[in-house]
C-alpha cells in the first residue's frame, strides 16, 4: 500500500494544530489529498485568508480527478449511497492504491475497507 490520502477533517485539524492530526501526518513520508479535499479546505476559509491557506496546503500533493476516479466514485456512490463528494475522495485513494485517513466515521465507516480512523474528537 502506498502513502495515504488525507480527508478534509484531518487537514483542517492539522491547520488548527491539533496534535492528533500532526502525529498522524508525521507517520508518512508523503502527504496526498484529492482536489475535492483541497477545495473543501479552501471553501471553509474567508476570502482574505485563502492565499495563506493555499500556500500552507501546498505541502500536500494534490491529485486531480480523472475518468478512472470519476468512474470509481460513481460505483461507490451507487453501491453505498455515500455523498458524491465523499465518494470522490474515497475513490481518489482507492484508484491510487492507498488508504484514506479520516476521523469522519459518519460518512466513512471505520470498518469500511481502505479507511483508517486514527483518532476521533
Residue spans for each PLM region:
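Short, well-structured N-terminal submotif of metal-dependent ribonuclease cores
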Residues: 1-33, 42-58
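Alpha-helix capping/helix-boundary segments
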Residues: 10-11, 37, 69, 88-89, ...
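Short active-site oxyanion
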Residues: 28-30, 59-61, 94-99
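Acidic catalytic patch
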Residues: 59-79
Amino acid at each position: 500500500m502506498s502513502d495515504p490520502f488525507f480527508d478534509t477533517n484531518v487537514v483542517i485539524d492539522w491547520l488548527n494544530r491539533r496534535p492528533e492530526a500532526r502525529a498522524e501526518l508525521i507517520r508518512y513520508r508523503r502527504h496526498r489529498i484529492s482536489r475535492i479535499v483541497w477545495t473543501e479546505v479552501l471553501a471553509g476559509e474567508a476570502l482574505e485568508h485563502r492565499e495563506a491557506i493555499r500556500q500552507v496546503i501546498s505541502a500536500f500533493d494534490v491529485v486531480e480527478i480523472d475518468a478512472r476516479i470519476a468512474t470509481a466514485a460513481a460505483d461507490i456512490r451507487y453501491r453505498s449511497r455515500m455523498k458524491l463528494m465523499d465518494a470522490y475522495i474515497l475513490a481518489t485513494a482507492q484508484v491510487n492504491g492507498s488508504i484514506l485517513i479520516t476521523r469522519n466515521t459518519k460518512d466513512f465507516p471505520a470498518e469500511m475497507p481502505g479507511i483508517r480512523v486514527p483518532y476521533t474528537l
